[in-house]
Amino acid sequence: MRAVLTVIGKDNVGIVAGVSNKLAELNINIVDVSQTIMDGYFTMMMMCDISQITKEFDEVKAELAGKGEDLQVKIHIQREEIFNAMHKL
């Protein structure tokens, strides 16, 4: 099972490390990542393997949102099938 994670906010030291460490803590593997900084704003999109999580997905979402607050960015995760359904033309 996979999920799409997005991170958006003002660029700051430690965003990638903070997000990566939190994902490892939640037993989430990063499958693919794209990251850029546009005019001082950090943007990152990750494809994640969530098949090994031990918590409910809503709890994972809440913990990642909390980590985003700590890092002063917005972190959003959603199941891949939901992401795909929302972005079909």
From Swiss-Prot:
It comes from the Bacteria. Coiled coil: none annotated. SUPFAM superfamilies: ACT-like. Residues 4-78 form the ACT domain. NCBIfam families: PRK00194.1. Pfam families: ACT_6 (PF13740). Belongs to the UPF0237 family. InterPro entries: ACT-like_dom_sf, ACT_dom, UPF0237/GcvR_regulator, UPF0237_ACT. This is UPF0237 protein lmo0533.
